[in-house]
């Protein structure tokens, strides 16, 4: 069956105008996650912000209680004892000038990037490479830190970085279709709570405007925002 026909069939039984309670929405999404691989469950949160204004930027990191189901490759820019700590904590790639050269050459072998503060003048050279990928280390989300071991373990243990996009939307993977409904709901509520706590001072009016959940290959299901309150 062609992908288009599969999507049309998957939409059957979903009221496109209804706002579902989060548990009901997840049930519908899981029932329609029928691909031959373990689909990622994704959340899209529309916020009442304009990220073009610095005082309306929303970003942060949250550790999902049940993990993401994905194994992240973690790269760390550090020297000496901190480099050793990163390796011991399970970092996939650790280096300093040597790692900068590798990344500048277009070889990025990590999904999350962490750096000690003293490395940032060096890492700053990679802004044009890491910035567009959303991978530039940032102290606000704990990826510029002296606690490299804790940051590596957090990344490996299910922490998710979120950042509002130009259209005012935050999108994040919160688990796999193989997760139980209960675990997915817990993860989504944890993400929503972190997004609410990251509300910027410049946000006006309704902050969380729309929420939808979907699987990698499945249709979106609209969610009643109030059902995300823990």
From Swiss-Prot:
Under the heading InterPro entries, the entry gives: Ribosom_uL1_bac-type, Ribosomal_uL1, Ribosomal_uL1-like, Ribosomal_uL1/biogenesis, Ribosomal_uL1_3-a/b-sand, Ribosomal_uL1_CS
Q: Which residues cross the membrane?
A: none
Q: Name one GO biological process term.
A: translation
Q: Reply yes or no: does the keyword Repressor apply.
A: yes
Which GO terms fall under molecular function for this chain's record? rRNA binding; structural constituent of ribosome; tRNA binding
Report quaternary structure and partners. Part of the 50S ribosomal subunit.
Query: What family is it from?
Result: Belongs to the universal ribosomal protein uL1 family.
Q: What is this protein called?
A: Large ribosomal subunit protein uL1
């Amino acid at each position: 069956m062609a992908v288009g026909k599969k999507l049309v069939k998957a939409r059957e039984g979903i009221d496109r105008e209804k706002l579902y309670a989060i548990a009901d929405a997840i049930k519908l999404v899981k029932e329609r996650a029928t691909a031959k691989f373990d689909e990622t469950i994704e959340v899209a949160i529309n916020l009442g912000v304009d990220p073009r204004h610095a005082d309306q930027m929303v970003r942060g990191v949250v550790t999902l209680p049940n993990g993401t189901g994905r194994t992240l490759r973690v790269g760390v820019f550090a020297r000496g004892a901190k480099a050793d700590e990163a390796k011991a904590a399970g970092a996939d790639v650790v280096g300093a000038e040597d790692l900068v050269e590798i990344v500048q050459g277009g070889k990025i072998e990590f999904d999350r990037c962490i750096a000690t503060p003293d490395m940032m003048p060096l890492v700053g050279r990679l802004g044009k490479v890491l910035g567009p990928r959303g991978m530039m280390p940032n102290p606000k989300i704990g990826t510029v830190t002296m606690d490299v071991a804790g940051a590596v373990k957090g990344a490996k243990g299910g922490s998710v970085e979120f950042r509002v996009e130009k259209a005012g939307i935050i999108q994040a993977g919160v688990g796999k279709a193989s997760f139980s409904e209960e675990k997915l709901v817990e993860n989504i509520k944890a993400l929503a709570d972190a997004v609410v706590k990251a509300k910027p001072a410049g946000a006006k009016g309704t902050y969380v405007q729309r929420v939808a959940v979907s699987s990698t290959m499945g249709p979106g299901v609209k969610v009643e925002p109030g059902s995300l309150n823990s």
